[in-house]
């Protein structure tokens, strides 16, 4: 296909043998859903690919590293989406059926476990949440690899998108609070250990990029930033 049409051949194509086009809302959601599908509560975003951010020194963490740095930036991004969807003039937006299913699966995982935010999340509950998020992403990915996008669209209320942003931000903020060190700094990278029925978390030493990321996340108040 690349030989026939050039660089467009590397894009996703639809059943009509044309480049599959989506709107900006769908592109913005796809970005954050790919991150949240690898979210480990109170730990960060699981670095389970072979491209763990810009810092080559963290290549050794692939597979069992968890990035709070990525979660800090995800918070900033999700807050932007919340503000954006709260200000748009439309009430509905059409999104690919496959992505809506992923969105609903991730959102229901957060909603069903919202009560856990009242305290520290146990290793068992952490594993249950990660497994549900991971299965949602696996189903989405397997469907695309096998069949591609079917071409169907679902109208999603902007109020649903706002609610999703709010709920996910609650989980993100809970994790940020859990990663505040006793000296007032914030953890940058953690390690996860998968046991038979849970996910255990251990902390690495402090790193500069963790402080830069949390300062830009929008989580801290001006007073906390100066402290």
Positions of PLM-derived features:
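Acidic, mature catalytic/reactive cores of soluble proteins
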Residues: 1-227
């Amino acid at each position: 296909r690349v030989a026939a049409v050039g660089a467009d051949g590397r894009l996703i194509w639809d059943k009509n043998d044309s480049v599959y086009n989506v709107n900006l809302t769908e592109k913005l959601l796809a970005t954050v859903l790919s991150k949240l599908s690898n979210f480990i509560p109170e730990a960060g975003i699981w670095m389970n690919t072979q491209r763990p951010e810009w810092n080559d020194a963290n290549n050794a963490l692939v597979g069992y590293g968890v990035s709070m740095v990525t979660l800090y930036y995800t918070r900033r991004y999700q807050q932007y989406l919340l503000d954006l969807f709260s200000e748009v003039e439309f009430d509905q937006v059409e999104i690919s059926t496959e992505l809506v299913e992923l969105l609903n699966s991730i959102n229901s995982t957060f909603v069903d476990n919202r009560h856990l935010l009242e305290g520290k999340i146990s290793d068992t509950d952490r594993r249950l949440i990660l497994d549900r998020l991971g299965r949602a992403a696996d189903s989405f990915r397997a469907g695309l690899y096998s069949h591609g996008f079917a071409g169907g669209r679902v109208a999603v209320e902007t109020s649903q998108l706002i609610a999703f942003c709010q709920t996910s931000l609650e989980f993100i903020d809970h994790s940020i609070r859990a990663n505040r060190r006793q000296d007032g700094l914030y953890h940058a990278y953690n390690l996860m250990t998968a046991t038979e029925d849970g996910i255990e978390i251990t902390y690495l030493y402090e790193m500069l990029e963790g402080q830069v990321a949390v300062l830009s996340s929008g989580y801290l108040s001006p007073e906390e930033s100066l402290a």
